[in-house]
């Protein structure tokens, strides 16, 4: 006689709850959430944005079938010293960013916090340069302060 593995009966509640708790650990999303692996591996440490200093400007080739050089910057984060690559969005946006500038970066919005579109391995984008919004600089509504 084949029966189900789940206990049945009037007093089976505790056993069912314990079994469910145990089974959760076989699901990778639950494990990542329970052990806070996202915060541990994320360069921003779970924060929505982070400040950093521009180390160098780089041009990355787009993935096939596109053909372009995507303008990016390498940024050293202030909070933990990690170096990440961030995309500079907008026409001629790279011209507003100089080495040793302080920038604010955020996630680029790819699937599961990963790279987006045809830019390989880039998970962040530049939001602000100094105190100026990147979007406003590109549109010409703000000028970058020269020291």
Swiss-Prot record:
Q: Does the keyword Electron transport apply?
A: no
Q: Which organism is it from?
A: Methanococcus aeolicus (strain ATCC BAA-1280 / DSM 17508 / OCM 812 / Nankai-3)
What PROSITE patterns does its record include? RIBOSOMAL_S12
Family designation: Belongs to the universal ribosomal protein uS12 family.
The Swiss-Prot or TrEMBL record annotates one GO molecular function as: structural constituent of ribosome
RNA-binding as a keyword of this entry, yes or no, is yes
Q: Which domain of life is it from?
A: Archaea
Pfam families in UniProt: Ribosom_S12_S23
Cellular component per GO, a single term: small ribosomal subunit
Q: Which GO terms describe its biological process?
A: translation
For this UniProt record, the keywords arranged alphabetically read as follows:
Ribonucleoprotein, Ribosomal protein, RNA-binding, rRNA-binding
Q: What does this protein do?
A: With S4 and S5 plays an important role in translational accuracy. Located at the interface of the 30S and 50S subunits.
In terms of InterPro entries, this protein maps to: NA-bd_OB-fold (IPR012340), Ribosomal_uS12 (IPR006032), Ribosomal_uS12_arc (IPR022863), Ribosomal_uS12_euk/arc (IPR005680)
Q: What is this protein called?
A: Small ribosomal subunit protein uS12
Assembly behavior: Part of the 30S ribosomal subunit.
